[in-house]
Amino acid sequence: MSNHLYDGVFAPHADSTKTFLYTADRDISFAKFTALTDRIAAMLVAQGLAPGDRVAVQADKSVLLFALYAATVKAGGVYLPLNTGYTPAELDYFLGDAKPGSVVTSNAAAEAITPIAARIGAVLMTLDSDESGSLSEAAVQHEGPFTAVPRGSEDLAAILYTS
């Protein structure tokens, strides 16, 4: 069994030096993006992520946020994006319902989310739009390559709450 989503979308280009992402201040090749996702995936697994575990994310868009999505899929997790405009009561509902093992949020929102994460037993990490935070600090401690965790075609890749 393979990880069909990661293998179909990201793996075919993993070693390419061609530019994958263009940002205002840098260009990122497929290979550099893969190395970044490998470090994040290894970090998630080291923190206890198992196949099917949820990773809830309420953070501003950035390259690292996109890499977190790819890394979650690669590590066999289920990505749970949460709108940055949700109130603490809404977050309490969504996090209580989904029961993620990890929660990623901005430093500014961490104070409100910390008691919720503690109540559900989730690891709390921070990630700001400038890519600073405990997630980036923890990820640099890990090296790749990271082999994608096998997932079946019926396994979840993401959970999207709607209004």
For each of these PLM feature ranges, what is it?
Residues 18, 31-56, 86-88, 92, ...:
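ANL superfamily AMP-binding
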Residues 59, 82-83, 105-106, 121-131:
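Short beta-strand elements of ligand-binding domains
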Residues 17, 142-161:
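Conserved pre-ATP/AMP-binding loop-to-beta segment of ANL
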Residues 86-116, 135-141:
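Conserved ATP-dependent adenylate/AMP-binding module captured primarily in the ANL superfamily
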Residues 9-12, 33, 37, 44, ...:
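Adenylate-forming
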Residues 78, 101, 123:
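Residue-level detector of anion-binding/catalytic polar loops
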Residues 7-29:
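AMP-dependent adenylate-forming
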Residues 26, 42-86:
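Conserved AMP-binding/adenylate-forming
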